[in-house]
Amino acid sequence: MKLRWLLILVVFLAGCSSKHDYTNPPWNPEVPVKRAMQWMPISEKAGAAWGVDPQLITAIIAIESGGNPAVVSKSGAVGLMQLKPSTSGRDVYRRMGWRGEPSVSELKNPERNISMGAAYLSILENGPLAGIKDPQVMRYAVVVSYANGAGALLRTFSSNRQDAIEEINDLDADEFFEHVVKKHPAPQAPRYIWKLQKALDAM
């Protein structure tokens, strides 16, 4: 009987540890970053237009599509920065004062995709995440929100946006990352930060 409960405990602890093992499966950024770097002139142009670091744009391209502009995910995300027409694409259109949403063919165009991806990063930083003071924390918050939504992130701190921002401002980058590991409902959220740092280090 004791052996049975010991085995159950081992399985339970293994499950708990694997839940937060954001490094598995392994990810080598070398090739994706190299392919993403070919779009750097466009990323620099889009970054300047929207006030977004082109290295951040390049890292997201490496993570999202590996530099392939024709990629369409099972969930319908399209192109280099894997934008969904009906969500992030629609948000960018609204920001530009346009109606509707971008087409799949538009999002497969590298220049249009990167421009709209940079615009969406700017929307996140200057909208739901506005007020975060630490630049590195802001970067982490932006990429987690890019991947899983700003609302999902902020709700791990508070149901009130301003209270959530104040709690975030009490954390440094490492503390913010640990919070995401422990509190964010999406297991890919801490993994995205981990991949972001690996991609930036590979540039």
Curated annotation (Swiss-Prot):
It comes from Klebsiella pneumoniae subsp. pneumoniae (strain ATCC 700721 / MGH 78578). CDD domains: LT_MltC_MltE. Belongs to the transglycosylase Slt family. Keywords: Cell outer membrane, Cell wall biogenesis/degradation, Lipoprotein, Lyase, Membrane, Palmitate, Signal. NCBIfam families: PRK15470.1. It is a lipid-anchor. GO terms for molecular function: lytic endotransglycosylase activity. GO terms for cellular component: cell outer membrane. It catalyses: Endolytic cleavage of the (1->4)-beta-glycosidic linkage between N-acetylmuramic acid (MurNAc) and N-acetylglucosamine (GlcNAc) residues in peptidoglycan with concomitant formation of a 1,6-anhydrobond in the MurNAc residue. Its main location: membrane. InterPro entries: EmtA, Lysozyme-like_dom_sf, Transglyc_AS, Transglycosylase_SLT_dom_1. The lineage of its organism: Bacteria, Pseudomonadati, Pseudomonadota, Gammaproteobacteria, Enterobacterales. This is Endo-type membrane-bound lytic murein transglycosylase A. Its EC number is 4.2.2.n2. The keyword Lyase applies. A lipid is attached at C16 (N-palmitoyl cysteine). Residues 1-15 form the signal peptide.
